[in-house]
Amino acid sequence: MLIQNTIFYSQEWRWAKFIKFLISQLDNYHCVEHKIASDFSYKESSYGSKKSKKNINLFTWGATHQKRINFARAVCINSPNYSVLNFLIIPKTSYNIPFLGVDFVSLPTSHLLVLDFQPSLKVENQFNSELLEQIIKLKKSCHSSLPVAEKMSEDVAKFFSPGLIWSRLAKHQDSDNLIENQLYDSFKEYLNLYLKTLFESEEVGHGLQQELINGQNDYLNYRRDNDPARPMLSSLFGKDFTESLINKVLFSTNKVL
């Protein structure tokens, strides 16, 4: 099943124009779609009481690039109460480049929004001053309209950069407008800057590459063990499916090369 033939490419899904832009930009850089195992590529389920059952759909999309990207994947969820776009780029460890992390989650009463160049090394060892200035500028522009959410704990904060966009919005029309306009514009700028940085970067030596491998593994292991979406996914799709999805697709260290 192609994602283009699903609800995730229609206006019914909140994040449709985000995933369309994302896929089109990866196409521009000659990324190749990666076939996800059928067990995880599409899943239907239902939740709620017998009298008010609601359907929910999940689609997992992936891509690679021979020289620059080990694995890029998007998990898309649609239902009346939950709408999710979770996206991660795992770059090749031949290049000293952070992850690109996107986590846009609409819950029954709020939206949780995360967008960042997520470091796999200490920030000072992975971001030069020019890149830091650029992402901080994008962050400030976005947060001139979107409120900044609560401070993260130290064990979580180390996996985010100074350019982190992190917001929590109540569900109402004003939030819809912010998502459709300010967040979408920031998302496009972030993605374009990330891909430009990744595809213009130079290869690193063996010693630094080993540090990057270790750093990527640390991040993926932490996310696998502490994924905040685990309870929600388990309640919607079952524990067995959720654990397999998290371990084999979303945060598998087999993707680190």
Swiss-Prot record:
Gene3D superfamilies: 3.40.1500.20. It is an enzyme of class 1 (oxidoreductase). Its EC number is 1.3.7.3. It catalyses: (3Z)-phycoerythrobilin + oxidized 2[4Fe-4S]-[ferredoxin] = 15,16-dihydrobiliverdin + reduced 2[4Fe-4S]-[ferredoxin] + 2 H(+). Pfam families: Fe_bilin_red. It comes from Prochlorococcus marinus subsp. pastoris (strain CCMP1986 / NIES-2087 / MED4). Coiled coil: none annotated. GO terms for biological process: phytochromobilin biosynthetic process. One of its GO terms (molecular function) is phycoerythrobilin:ferredoxin oxidoreductase activity. InterPro entries: Ferredoxin-dep_bilin_Rdtase (IPR009249), Phycoerythrobilin_Fdx_Rdtase (IPR022827). This is Phycoerythrobilin:ferredoxin oxidoreductase. Catalyzes the two-electron reduction of the C2 and C3(1) diene system of 15,16-dihydrobiliverdin. It comes from the Bacteria. The keyword Nucleus does not apply. Keywords: Oxidoreductase. Belongs to the HY2 family. Signal peptide: none annotated.
